[in-house]
Amino acid sequence: MSVVLLSSTSATITKSQSKKIPFLSPTTKFPLKVSISPSRSKLFHNPLRVAAPPSVPTSDSTEEKRIEEEYGGDKEEEGSEFKWRDHWYPVSLVEDLDPNVPTPFQLLGRDLVLWFDRNDQKWAAFDDLCPHRLAPLSEGRLDENGHLQCSYHGWSFGGCGSCTRIPQAATSGPEARAVKSPRACAIKFPTMVSQGLLFVWPDENGWDRANSIEPPRLPDDFDKPEFSTVTIQRDLFYGYDTLMENVSDPSHIDFAHHKVTGRRDRAKPLPFKVESSGPWGFQGANDDSPRITAKFVAPCYSMNKIELDAKLPIVGNQKWVIWICSFNIPMAPGKTRSIVCSARNFFQFSVPGPAWWQVVPRWYEHWTSNLVYDGDMIVLQGQEKVFLAKSMESPDYDVNKQYTKLTFTPTQADRFVLAFRNWLRRHGKSQPEWFGSTPSNQPLPSTVLTKRQMLDRFDQHTQVCSSCKGAYNSFQILKKFLVGATVFWAATAGVPSDVQIRLVLAGLSLISAASAYALHEQEKNFVFRDYVHSEIE
């Protein structure tokens, strides 16, 4: 989903061909010569290595053996067992959180509330229930003292989780002392802000462990001024494994995202090789051009780097670098948050200054990004339905173990997909370690939601994006103004006796009406756009 493929090896690009390559500026002069460097610099280092994947199909029996040898040869060191709750998880882009209100979030099936403690100037994460009568704290507010207040009975809590006020308690005696009781405290989780991301450690007893481990970081290029960055988050109604398989698969780009970030006529063999793997994840690259390096850092971090050497008129030779980094956070069974951070060092459209000063606003970038999500949505829904149906056949049925029997993956383009499925089976216990029970008879979202609901941008993205939410509200206000202007100009057009003035007023009414309609159509980019692959020629 989140990888952009640029498949020219050494070519002269004409103006008519430029649409085949994403990020090209409309003002670029043509012809444009682009060549790919054959060098293979080591982006990631790990001593574990595996054999290169074969390029010919094998039988089912030999395929299972080959997969086990290829991806299962890593040796676990003592204490290296993977534990789902022993990691930092990014839960949101900080710029998309409102510090004035509590925000609900699910992580590994556990309900949390995220809120900003203005006394300590830190973000906090609590269990989303009040210790009094178990009401959700996310329905509360920040009181006059900057504490999180429950909306049910008004109990308030400080950033450390301790209760600071019980309105119903007497001023003396046992009731007055209740506010100091450990039972009156909210359950708090470790949090950390790093590179614009809010991370949560999903173990309230894991403070020492959390303090000893740094959260996963974006590459250093994201902090360099020569790189232009775009960030987006969206909540998706399919499972963690479905999304991780998708982001591990560069070969779908040219078809699922035709004329968005890829083109069908650019599809070609992708000779990927897994170079190392283990409980930590896996990494690999291709031997072709452009050079694509990929790394999965368990449990949810996927990095892709694309490198090209470009020969441009006037400016000369340039090294083009594209980073696509995604965090795929398991919220609950059948629901995953995708946070994508991308960067490139060419054709930048961002300038120093505040968000309103940008040439291309963030919300407009998200219109394209959401097209990428939409291009995958219904395809992945259908795939997940098949896997879920298979898993219902038997309580012991493991899709990851049977993956090479359920699917046919004869090419090297699927190497990273197989590597992820093998990692999930060998180290991840085939699924995230959810909090609480997960009833097997409860239908998952992808099995019951309609296409309209699956593609609903408003609830999945606009409501959790500060830029798009603000732009949508502005569109609403402007549209109402234009509708009012239409009525006003139309009403006043009949007043003057001068025909020319009447025509001018009628024209203004038509312009206002057309503008209101155009704005209404653009609003759909924040709410819902149908996506039909067969209609994209």
Curated annotation (Swiss-Prot):
Record PROSITE patterns: RIESKE (PS51296)
EC main group: oxidoreductase
Catalytic activity: pheophorbide a + 2 reduced [2Fe-2S]-[ferredoxin] + O2 + 2 H(+) = red chlorophyll catabolite + 2 oxidized [2Fe-2S]-[ferredoxin]
TM helices/strands, residue ranges: none
Activity regulation (UniProt): Might be regulated by a phosphorylation/dephosphorylation mechanism.
Main location (coarse class): plastid
GO cellular component entries: chloroplast; chloroplast envelope; chloroplast inner membrane; chloroplast thylakoid; chloroplast thylakoid membrane; cytosol
Official protein name in the record: Pheophorbide a oxygenase, chloroplastic
Source organism: Arabidopsis thaliana (Mouse-ear cress)
Gene: PAO
